[in-house]
């Protein structure tokens, strides 16, 4: 074959291969995560005494429970006067790129500190978390360093933060024990602001945004606090509640869905508030069992009773008929 024919042929083969490669569907890389470990912890909200613990020192991914630390730093800035509720936070283009859950902020607009706190605690808005971080520290990365430093100051030895929202990062982790320390600290250090966690909705741009924290919204005596979820973390929840003068801080993490998570939380709270468990009461009540002979005897008695009733009805009808015939005559 001559060189003149060979060169175009090679070009055609290469070009055809390139077209096939581009046309072939690209396989999406499926990331598989290990099933999260379920952890739980209940402590006395006044003394810090541990009332229940299960895998509480196991390192976990906090997901949006991260935002409790973000809010802690906001409360601290409010207390020192660095921020005020009316202070306006600038929204950057970078902040608007945050993935849901979000408030769908627009680049260049501003949002107040108070609305930001509500958006974090009620909506769990990631774009707001980035906005807060950038306004308070210049960047989310710098803000995350401040979060980790504060964690150490609060005695959270097994916690590390890399972002303000809780978006998954393998290097962002904590434990139920550390989350309890953070919750106790935010109650203790900012009693004047802590009550904001009890809000179940807020209005932003004329739209009412409701909480999806069902336990906080419906459990008797619940005060707050925060939900969290992404696939590697599972469904997480921190709840604070007070009943009959007794205060509890409870953490539940790693559940497959919000229903099992909430059920677990309610059971823990009920148990340590001393609320009688209906299922336990039913289980403890002795259920009478019938032997076969007893069942036969009961069935026989029922049959006799029915037969007697039918017989009585016939007699009454017969008596009425006779009486009717006599009166006509």
Q: What spans do the regions from the language model cover?
A:
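Bacterial N-terminal signal peptides that target proteins for export
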Residues: 1-8
């Amino acid at each position: 074959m001559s060189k003149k024919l060979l060169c175009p042929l090679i070009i055609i083969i290469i070009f055809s291969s390139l077209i096939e490669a581009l046309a072939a569907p690209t396989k999406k890389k499926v990331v598989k995560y290990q099933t999260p470990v379920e952890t739980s912890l209940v402590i006395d909200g006044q003394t810090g005494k541990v009332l229940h613990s299960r895998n509480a020192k196991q390192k976990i991914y906090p997901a949006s429970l991260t935002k409790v630390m973000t809010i802690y730093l906001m409360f601290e800035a409010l207390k020192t006067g660095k921020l005020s509720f009316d202070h306006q936070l600038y929204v950057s283009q970078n902040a608007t790129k945050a993935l849901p859950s979000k408030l769908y902020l627009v680049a260049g607009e501003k949002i107040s500190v108070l609305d930001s706190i509500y958006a974090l605690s009620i909506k769990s808005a990631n774009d707001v978390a980035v906005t807060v971080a950038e306004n308070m520290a210049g960047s989310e990365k710098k803000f995350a360093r401040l979060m980790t430093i504060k964690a150490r100051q609060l005695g959270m030895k097994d916690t590390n933060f890399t972002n303000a929202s809780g978006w998954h990062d393998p290097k962002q982790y904590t434990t139920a024990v550390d989350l309890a320390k953070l919750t106790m600290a935010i109650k203790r250090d900012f009693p004047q602001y802590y009550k904001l966690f009890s809000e179940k909705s807020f209005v932003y741009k004329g739209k009412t945004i409701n909480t999806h924290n069902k336990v906080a919204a419906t459990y008797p005596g619940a005060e707050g606090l925060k939900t969290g979820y992404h696939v590697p973390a599972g469904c997480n929840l921190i709840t604070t509640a007070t009943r009959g003068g007794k205060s509890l801080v409870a953490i539940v993490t790693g559940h497959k869905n919000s229903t099992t998570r909430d059920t677990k939380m309610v059971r823990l709270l009920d148990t340590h508030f001393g609320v009688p468990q209906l299922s336990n009461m039913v289980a403890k009540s002795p259920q009478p069992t019938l032997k076969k002979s007893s069942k036969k005897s009961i069935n026989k008695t029922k049959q006799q009773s029915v037969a007697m009733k039918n017989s009585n009805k016939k007699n009454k009808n017969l008596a009425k008929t006779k009486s009717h015939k006599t009166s006509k005559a």
